[in-house]
């Protein structure tokens, strides 16, 4: 199995997915903590929850994109 | 790309996980021109047909007690209408048809892509970038038409201290122009990553020792993908609503 520096870079870019996982977990965990304190207000905030998750996740997807570019375009 | 696609023996996989995203002509081989019917064309057409069938046939009977297809049609209509009204307010409701179209196309294309051996048009950046750029230009033009130069107040955060405002304006400007990029890449990236992961596990199924684990993993990932398909369509739609709200009410 041969490989070059681009493959190492793609592997390093995969660390970004883990960072995005921390971010998404933070958003969802804090939402749950708040929702358990005030369950009546939770239902109205699910849209905000998904927007927050989407923003956190987008940066992980950017890392995935960098990995893809290194694998197939470089 | 070609060398990776044939590299079955070096990676240990029977097929390459990214092969499923290759666009092929439907009839014969040859080059792909803009008018060539490809598998992407086929599955986009199928998803539009499915949306039309669901909404037109579902609402054609107008039963007092709705049947299954009528329930789904009414539920999706009510779901999107409530989302638009909650985020954009009453005056955003007239842009509801566009947002409903976006949502139905994305969610049905995502679900159809989960059929084995099918093709996922939303996993291509070309498809999602067109949708995101359409939203971006529509929202920007709408903002200037509705508010005139007051739309630029979106970048001038009047609640911040005066010294900070130019710096914030630059940041807001950058984040405004990155919107179509992140908007399109989020959808395509999620769908592409999910399908690639399923294919990677499917490749492991050829190895006898790993095959029970990989079949279980495919089932689990498939369940997750059903969820992701819906959530990403929802997120795309809700972000469109948020951008539309910014255009209609640009004050911070």
From Swiss-Prot, chain A:
Source domain of life: Bacteria
Gene Ontology CC entries for this record: plasma membrane; proton-transporting ATP synthase complex; proton-transporting two-sector ATPase complex, proton-transporting domain
GO molecular function: lipid binding; proton-transporting ATP synthase activity, rotational mechanism
Keyword Cell membrane found: yes
Gene3D superfamilies membership: F1F0 ATP synthase subunit C
UniProt KW Transport keyword: yes
Compartment list: Cell inner membrane
Membrane topology: Multi-pass membrane protein
Key words, A-Z: ATP synthesis, Cell inner membrane, Cell membrane, CF(0), Hydrogen ion transport, Ion transport, Lipid-binding, Membrane, Transmembrane, Transmembrane helix, Transport
Pfam families recorded: ATP-synt_C (PF00137)
Residue ranges crossing the lipid bilayer per the database entry: 5-25, 49-69
Swiss-Prot/TrEMBL site (Reversibly protonated during proton transport) positions: 57
Family according to the record: Belongs to the ATPase C chain family.
Entry-linked HAMAP family: ATP_synth_c_bact (MF_01396)
Quaternary structure and interacting proteins, as annotated: F-type ATPases have 2 components, F(1) - the catalytic core - and F(0) - the membrane proton channel. F(1) has five subunits: alpha(3), beta(3), gamma(1), delta(1), epsilon(1). F(0) has three main subunits: a(1), b(2) and c(10-14). The alpha and beta chains form an alternating ring which encloses part of the gamma chain. F(1) is attached to F(0) by a central stalk formed by the gamma and epsilon chains, while a peripheral stalk is formed by the delta and b chains.
Stated role: F(1)F(0) ATP synthase produces ATP from ADP in the presence of a proton or sodium gradient. F-type ATPases consist of two structural domains, F(1) containing the extramembraneous catalytic core and F(0) containing the membrane proton channel, linked together by a central stalk and a peripheral stalk. During catalysis, ATP synthesis in the catalytic domain of F(1) is coupled via a rotary mechanism of the central stalk subunits to proton translocation.
Protein name: ATP synthase subunit c
């Amino acid at each position: 199995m041969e490989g070059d520096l681009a493959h190492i870079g793609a592997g390093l870019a995969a660390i970004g997915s883990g960072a995005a996982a921390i971010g998404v977990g933070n958003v969802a965990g804090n939402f749950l903590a708040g929702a358990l304190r005030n369950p009546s207000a939770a239902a109205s905030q699910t849209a905000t929850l998904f927007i927050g998750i989407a923003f956190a996740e987008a940066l992980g997807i950017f890392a995935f994109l960098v990995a893809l570019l290194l694998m197939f375009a470089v | 790309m070609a060398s990776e696609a044939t590299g079955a023996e070096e990676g240990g996989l029977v097929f390459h996980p990214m092969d499923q995203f290759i666009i092929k002509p439907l009839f014969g081989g040859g080059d792909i021109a803009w008018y060539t019917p490809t598998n992407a064309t086929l599955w986009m057409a199928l998803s539009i047909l499915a949306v039309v069938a669901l909404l037109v046939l579902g609402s054609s009977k107008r039963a007092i007690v709705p049947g299954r297809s009528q329930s789904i049609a009414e539920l999706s209509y009510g779901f999107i209408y409530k989302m638009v009204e909650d985020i954009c307010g009453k005056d955003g409701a007239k842009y509801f048809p566009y947002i409903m179209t976006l949502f139905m196309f994305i969610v049905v294309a995502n679900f159809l892509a989960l059929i084995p051996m099918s093709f996922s048009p939303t996993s291509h950046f070309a498809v999602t970038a067109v949708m995101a750029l359409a939203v971006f230009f529509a929202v920007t033009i709408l903002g200037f038409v509705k508010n005139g130069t007051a739309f630029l107040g979106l970048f001038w955060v009047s609640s911040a201290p005066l010294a900070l405002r130019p710096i914030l304006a630059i940041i807001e400007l950058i984040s405004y122009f990155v919107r179509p990029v992140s908007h399109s890449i989020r959808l395509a990236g999620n769908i592409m990553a999910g399908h690639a992961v399923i294919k990677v596990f499917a490749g492991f199924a050829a190895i006898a020792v790993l095959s029970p684990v990989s079949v279980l993993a495919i089932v689990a990932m498939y369940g997750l993908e059903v969820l992701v398909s819906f959530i990403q369509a929802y997120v795309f739609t809700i972000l469109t609503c948020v951008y539309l709200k910014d255009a209609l009410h640009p004050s911070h």
